[in-house]
Amino acid sequence: MNRWKTKRLGDFILFQRGFDLLAKDRTEGNIPVISSSGITGFHNQYKAKSPGVIIGRKGTLGTVHYSEQDYWPHDTTLWVTDFKGNLPRFIYYFLPLLQLEKYDVGSSNPTLNRNYIHEIIATLPPLEEQQKIAAVLS
């Protein structure tokens, strides 16, 4: 465990807010639209390349979703734009351990702010160990 690194989460991965897409503006296709509660429909365009790790930002906070195909991360989510050399599948398994719902900054509607999430102190193993851990959990 001596090769594990402790840093800000934002030093390991970067989140970005998803994109608005009203149901009336969708064109039927095979691209999943992923919201804080999971796949909420399909569209004919993607905004993010796979693999994808997406977390609930509004409403259903901290839920973690994984996409093996290109996808549209909805405005109610934060999605990982840069894994910074970390294994996406491992990050998918790791994020629930942080209990992200504790970082709610909303008053009437539960909300996560990526700036706060990036400041969480986290400890991650090197890539080789991430691969082994993800293989066992998959």
Task: Label every PLM stretch briefly.
Residues M1-S35, T123-A134:
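Non-catalytic DNA-recognition/assembly elements of restriction-modification systems
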Residues S35-L97, E101, V105-S108, L112-I117:
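A short beta-sheet element
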